[in-house]
From Swiss-Prot:
Keywords: DNA damage, DNA repair, DNA-binding, Glycosidase, Hydrolase, Lyase, Metal-binding, Multifunctional enzyme, Zinc, Zinc-finger. GO terms for biological process: base-excision repair. Binds 1 zinc ion per subunit. It comes from Nocardioides sp. (strain ATCC BAA-499 / JS614). This is Formamidopyrimidine-DNA glycosylase. Its EC number is 3.2.2.23, 4.2.99.18.
Length: 295
Protein backbone atom coordinates (compact mmCIF):
# COMPACT_ATOMS: atom_id res chain seq x y z
CA UNK A 1 0.00 0.00 0.00
CA UNK A 2 1.34 3.48 -0.82
CA UNK A 3 2.51 5.26 2.33
CA UNK A 4 3.13 8.93 3.07
CA UNK A 5 6.12 9.46 0.73
CA UNK A 6 4.39 7.81 -2.23
CA UNK A 7 1.15 9.75 -1.67
CA UNK A 8 3.07 13.02 -1.25
CA UNK A 9 4.86 12.40 -4.56
CA UNK A 10 1.45 12.01 -6.23
CA UNK A 11 0.11 15.14 -4.49
CA UNK A 12 3.06 17.20 -5.67
CA UNK A 13 2.56 15.94 -9.21
CA UNK A 14 -1.12 16.87 -9.15
CA UNK A 15 -0.21 20.31 -7.84
CA UNK A 16 2.06 20.84 -10.84
CA UNK A 17 -0.35 19.59 -13.50
CA UNK A 18 -4.01 20.14 -12.55
CA UNK A 19 -4.26 23.35 -10.50
CA UNK A 20 -6.62 25.80 -12.13
CA UNK A 21 -8.04 23.17 -14.47
CA UNK A 22 -11.80 22.83 -14.95
CA UNK A 23 -13.35 19.37 -14.95
CA UNK A 24 -15.17 19.25 -18.29
CA UNK A 25 -16.38 15.65 -18.20
CA UNK A 26 -16.36 12.68 -15.83
CA UNK A 27 -16.54 9.06 -17.01
CA UNK A 28 -17.10 6.41 -14.34
CA UNK A 29 -16.04 3.18 -16.03
CA UNK A 30 -16.58 0.96 -12.98
CA UNK A 31 -18.88 1.76 -10.03
CA UNK A 32 -16.77 0.22 -7.27
CA UNK A 33 -14.15 3.01 -6.98
CA UNK A 34 -16.92 5.57 -6.30
CA UNK A 35 -18.85 3.31 -3.89
CA UNK A 36 -18.28 5.68 -0.95
CA UNK A 37 -20.09 8.50 -2.76
CA UNK A 38 -23.76 8.18 -1.81
CA UNK A 39 -24.79 10.05 -4.98
CA UNK A 40 -23.90 7.03 -7.09
CA UNK A 41 -21.77 7.17 -10.25
CA UNK A 42 -24.06 9.61 -12.08
CA UNK A 43 -24.34 11.93 -9.09
CA UNK A 44 -20.59 11.74 -8.51
CA UNK A 45 -19.96 12.82 -12.09
CA UNK A 46 -22.55 15.62 -11.93
CA UNK A 47 -21.05 17.01 -8.70
CA UNK A 48 -17.64 17.38 -10.36
CA UNK A 49 -18.53 18.53 -13.86
CA UNK A 50 -17.81 22.23 -14.38
CA UNK A 51 -15.86 22.61 -11.14
CA UNK A 52 -12.37 24.16 -11.03
CA UNK A 53 -9.52 22.51 -9.10
CA UNK A 54 -8.05 24.97 -6.59
CA UNK A 55 -5.28 22.99 -4.85
CA UNK A 56 -3.87 19.53 -4.08
CA UNK A 57 -3.71 18.53 -0.42
CA UNK A 58 -2.94 15.49 1.70
CA UNK A 59 -3.44 14.15 5.18
CA UNK A 60 -1.65 10.89 5.86
CA UNK A 61 -2.46 8.58 2.96
CA UNK A 62 -5.52 10.55 1.78
CA UNK A 63 -5.47 13.08 -1.05
CA UNK A 64 -8.03 15.72 -1.84
CA UNK A 65 -8.49 18.37 -4.52
CA UNK A 66 -10.38 21.43 -3.20
CA UNK A 67 -12.92 22.73 -5.72
CA UNK A 68 -14.12 26.27 -6.44
CA UNK A 69 -17.51 25.68 -4.75
CA UNK A 70 -16.04 24.58 -1.39
CA UNK A 71 -16.39 20.85 -2.03
CA UNK A 72 -13.45 18.51 -2.61
CA UNK A 73 -12.58 15.44 -4.63
CA UNK A 74 -11.32 13.01 -1.97
CA UNK A 75 -9.18 10.03 -2.90
CA UNK A 76 -7.39 7.06 -1.37
CA UNK A 77 -5.08 4.87 -3.45
CA UNK A 78 -5.74 1.69 -1.46
CA UNK A 79 -3.39 -1.16 -2.39
CA UNK A 80 -2.92 -0.50 -6.09
CA UNK A 81 -4.54 2.82 -7.00
CA UNK A 82 -2.87 5.28 -9.35
CA UNK A 83 -3.74 8.88 -10.26
CA UNK A 84 -2.25 9.58 -13.68
CA UNK A 85 -2.21 12.78 -15.74
CA UNK A 86 -2.39 11.75 -19.39
CA UNK A 87 -2.93 13.37 -22.78
CA UNK A 88 -6.43 12.64 -24.14
CA UNK A 89 -5.07 10.49 -26.96
CA UNK A 90 -3.09 8.18 -24.65
CA UNK A 91 -4.34 4.57 -24.76
CA UNK A 92 -6.60 3.59 -21.88
CA UNK A 93 -4.84 1.74 -19.09
CA UNK A 94 -5.98 -1.85 -18.53
CA UNK A 95 -7.48 -1.07 -15.13
CA UNK A 96 -8.76 2.45 -15.84
CA UNK A 97 -11.78 3.07 -13.56
CA UNK A 98 -12.52 6.82 -13.63
CA UNK A 99 -11.58 9.48 -16.17
CA UNK A 100 -11.76 13.26 -15.63
CA UNK A 101 -11.35 15.33 -18.78
CA UNK A 102 -9.67 18.63 -17.86
CA UNK A 103 -9.66 21.99 -19.58
CA UNK A 104 -7.02 24.65 -19.02
CA UNK A 105 -4.37 22.29 -17.63
CA UNK A 106 -1.32 21.57 -19.80
CA UNK A 107 -3.36 22.29 -22.95
CA UNK A 108 -5.99 19.69 -22.15
CA UNK A 109 -5.22 16.61 -20.09
CA UNK A 110 -7.06 13.78 -18.42
CA UNK A 111 -6.82 12.83 -14.77
CA UNK A 112 -7.20 9.06 -14.65
CA UNK A 113 -7.85 6.82 -11.65
CA UNK A 114 -6.39 3.38 -12.35
CA UNK A 115 -6.84 0.61 -9.79
CA UNK A 116 -6.27 -3.09 -10.37
CA UNK A 117 -7.56 -4.37 -7.02
CA UNK A 118 -10.11 -1.59 -6.45
CA UNK A 119 -9.51 -1.17 -2.71
CA UNK A 120 -9.00 2.55 -3.30
CA UNK A 121 -11.62 5.04 -4.32
CA UNK A 122 -12.85 8.55 -5.05
CA UNK A 123 -15.74 10.55 -3.61
CA UNK A 124 -16.98 14.13 -3.48
CA UNK A 125 -16.76 15.61 0.03
CA UNK A 126 -19.41 18.28 0.56
CA UNK A 127 -17.79 21.38 2.07
CA UNK A 128 -14.50 19.50 2.37
CA UNK A 129 -12.16 21.96 0.66
CA UNK A 130 -10.21 22.83 3.83
CA UNK A 131 -10.40 19.36 5.42
CA UNK A 132 -12.91 16.70 4.37
CA UNK A 133 -14.97 15.69 7.43
CA UNK A 134 -14.58 12.05 6.39
CA UNK A 135 -10.91 12.18 7.37
CA UNK A 136 -10.97 14.76 10.18
CA UNK A 137 -10.30 11.99 12.73
CA UNK A 138 -6.99 11.08 11.11
CA UNK A 139 -3.93 12.41 12.92
CA UNK A 140 -1.40 14.74 11.35
CA UNK A 141 1.67 13.10 9.86
CA UNK A 142 5.26 13.59 11.07
CA UNK A 143 6.11 15.86 8.12
CA UNK A 144 3.24 18.22 8.93
CA UNK A 145 4.61 21.48 10.45
CA UNK A 146 1.77 21.37 13.00
CA UNK A 147 2.52 17.82 14.18
CA UNK A 148 2.80 17.90 18.00
CA UNK A 149 5.93 15.98 18.99
CA UNK A 150 5.35 16.37 22.73
CA UNK A 151 1.80 15.04 22.53
CA UNK A 152 2.95 12.08 20.42
CA UNK A 153 5.65 11.18 22.97
CA UNK A 154 3.19 11.38 25.86
CA UNK A 155 0.58 9.24 24.13
CA UNK A 156 3.06 6.56 23.08
CA UNK A 157 4.44 6.27 26.61
CA UNK A 158 0.97 5.93 28.12
CA UNK A 159 0.22 2.81 26.09
CA UNK A 160 1.23 -0.77 26.78
CA UNK A 161 0.89 -1.86 23.14
CA UNK A 162 3.94 -2.49 20.98
CA UNK A 163 5.50 0.58 19.42
CA UNK A 164 5.15 -0.67 15.84
CA UNK A 165 1.42 -1.14 16.33
CA UNK A 166 1.32 2.46 17.54
CA UNK A 167 3.23 3.72 14.50
CA UNK A 168 0.54 2.16 12.31
CA UNK A 169 -2.32 3.75 14.28
CA UNK A 170 -3.61 6.49 11.97
CA UNK A 171 -5.42 8.11 14.90
CA UNK A 172 -2.07 8.66 16.62
CA UNK A 173 0.24 9.40 13.69
CA UNK A 174 -0.76 9.20 10.04
CA UNK A 175 1.05 8.23 6.89
CA UNK A 176 3.36 5.62 8.44
CA UNK A 177 2.85 2.16 6.98
CA UNK A 178 4.59 -1.17 7.27
CA UNK A 179 7.65 -0.32 5.18
CA UNK A 180 8.65 2.91 6.89
CA UNK A 181 7.73 1.65 10.37
CA UNK A 182 10.21 -1.21 9.94
CA UNK A 183 12.86 1.13 8.55
CA UNK A 184 12.46 3.68 11.36
CA UNK A 185 12.58 0.95 14.01
CA UNK A 186 15.74 -0.51 12.45
CA UNK A 187 17.42 2.90 12.44
CA UNK A 188 16.39 3.50 16.06
CA UNK A 189 17.45 -0.05 17.13
CA UNK A 190 14.04 -0.68 18.68
CA UNK A 191 12.06 -3.92 18.43
CA UNK A 192 8.54 -3.35 17.16
CA UNK A 193 6.98 -5.30 20.03
CA UNK A 194 8.57 -3.14 22.72
CA UNK A 195 5.68 -1.61 24.71
CA UNK A 196 5.37 2.15 24.53
CA UNK A 197 5.35 2.50 28.31
CA UNK A 198 8.78 0.83 28.45
CA UNK A 199 10.42 3.46 26.25
CA UNK A 200 11.93 6.65 27.61
CA UNK A 201 10.80 9.97 26.19
CA UNK A 202 14.24 10.34 24.61
CA UNK A 203 13.90 7.01 22.79
CA UNK A 204 10.45 7.89 21.46
CA UNK A 205 11.79 11.21 20.17
CA UNK A 206 14.68 9.40 18.49
CA UNK A 207 12.23 7.00 16.82
CA UNK A 208 10.11 9.91 15.59
CA UNK A 209 13.22 11.61 14.20
CA UNK A 210 14.17 8.42 12.34
CA UNK A 211 10.65 8.13 10.93
CA UNK A 212 11.00 11.65 9.55
CA UNK A 213 14.46 10.92 8.16
CA UNK A 214 13.41 7.79 6.30
CA UNK A 215 10.31 9.45 4.86
CA UNK A 216 12.25 12.49 3.66
CA UNK A 217 14.84 10.19 2.10
CA UNK A 218 12.08 8.23 0.36
CA UNK A 219 10.53 11.47 -0.91
CA UNK A 220 13.87 12.41 -2.42
CA UNK A 221 13.90 9.16 -4.39
CA UNK A 222 10.29 9.25 -5.53
CA UNK A 223 8.97 6.72 -3.02
CA UNK A 224 9.26 2.95 -2.86
CA UNK A 225 8.14 0.74 -5.77
CA UNK A 226 8.30 -3.04 -5.52
CA UNK A 227 6.16 -3.54 -8.64
CA UNK A 228 4.33 -1.55 -11.31
CA UNK A 229 1.38 -0.78 -9.02
CA UNK A 230 2.91 2.33 -7.44
CA UNK A 231 3.81 5.13 -9.86
CA UNK A 232 3.67 8.92 -9.80
CA UNK A 233 1.27 10.98 -11.93
CA UNK A 234 3.57 10.53 -14.94
CA UNK A 235 3.64 6.74 -14.56
CA UNK A 236 7.19 6.67 -13.18
CA UNK A 237 8.28 4.35 -10.35
CA UNK A 238 10.21 5.43 -7.27
CA UNK A 239 13.50 3.75 -6.36
CA UNK A 240 13.82 4.02 -2.56
CA UNK A 241 13.48 0.21 -2.40
CA UNK A 242 17.21 0.15 -3.20
CA UNK A 243 17.91 2.00 0.06
CA UNK A 244 15.93 -0.18 2.48
CA UNK A 245 17.86 -1.62 5.43
CA UNK A 246 15.30 -4.03 6.89
CA UNK A 247 12.01 -4.28 5.01
CA UNK A 248 11.92 -7.11 2.47
CA UNK A 249 15.49 -8.24 3.32
CA UNK A 250 14.79 -11.51 5.13
CA UNK A 251 17.95 -13.60 5.41
CA UNK A 252 20.24 -10.81 4.19
CA UNK A 253 22.99 -9.51 6.46
CA UNK A 254 22.16 -6.56 8.69
CA UNK A 255 24.20 -3.63 7.42
CA UNK A 256 25.29 -2.80 10.99
CA UNK A 257 26.20 -6.14 12.57
CA UNK A 258 25.96 -8.80 9.83
CA UNK A 259 23.22 -10.83 11.53
CA UNK A 260 20.59 -12.14 9.07
CA UNK A 261 17.46 -10.00 8.98
CA UNK A 262 14.46 -11.88 10.37
CA UNK A 263 10.84 -11.79 9.23
CA UNK A 264 7.86 -12.51 11.50
CA UNK A 265 4.10 -12.35 10.92
CA UNK A 266 2.49 -9.16 12.19
CA UNK A 267 -1.13 -8.01 11.82
CA UNK A 268 -1.72 -9.95 8.57
CA UNK A 269 1.54 -8.65 7.15
CA UNK A 270 5.26 -9.06 7.90
CA UNK A 271 7.77 -7.33 10.14
CA UNK A 272 11.48 -7.26 9.31
CA UNK A 273 14.14 -6.59 11.95
CA UNK A 274 17.64 -7.45 13.14
CA UNK A 275 17.44 -9.77 16.18
CA UNK A 276 20.76 -8.43 17.52
CA UNK A 277 20.41 -4.69 16.93
CA UNK A 278 16.71 -4.81 17.84
CA UNK A 279 16.45 -7.29 20.72
CA UNK A 280 12.98 -8.51 21.61
CA UNK A 281 11.59 -7.11 24.88
CA UNK A 282 11.37 -9.33 27.91
CA UNK A 283 7.91 -10.48 28.81
CA UNK A 284 6.25 -8.70 31.69
CA UNK A 285 6.09 -10.63 34.92
CA UNK A 286 2.59 -11.85 35.62
CA UNK A 287 0.98 -10.36 38.70
CA UNK A 288 0.95 -12.74 41.65
CA UNK A 289 -2.31 -14.64 41.98
CA UNK A 290 -1.62 -15.91 45.50
CA UNK A 291 -4.18 -14.91 48.09
CA UNK A 292 -2.84 -14.08 51.52
CA UNK A 293 -4.68 -15.93 54.27
CA UNK A 294 -4.90 -13.92 57.51
CA UNK A 295 -3.35 -15.43 60.63
Amino acid sequence: MPELPEVEVVRAGLERHVLGATIARVDVLHPRPVRRDLRGPAGFAAALTGRRIEAARRRGKYLWLPLDNGDALLGHLGMSGQLLVQPPDAPDERHLRVRLALEGADEGRELRFVDQRMFGGLSVSAGGADLPPEIAHIARDPLDPEFDDDDFVRRVRRRTSGVKRQLLDQNLISGVGNIYADEALWRARIHGERPGDRLTATRVRELLAHAREVMLAALGEGGTSFDALYVNVNGESGYFDRSLHAYGREGEACERCGTPIRRVAFMNRSSYFCPVCQPAPRRRRAASSRVRVPD
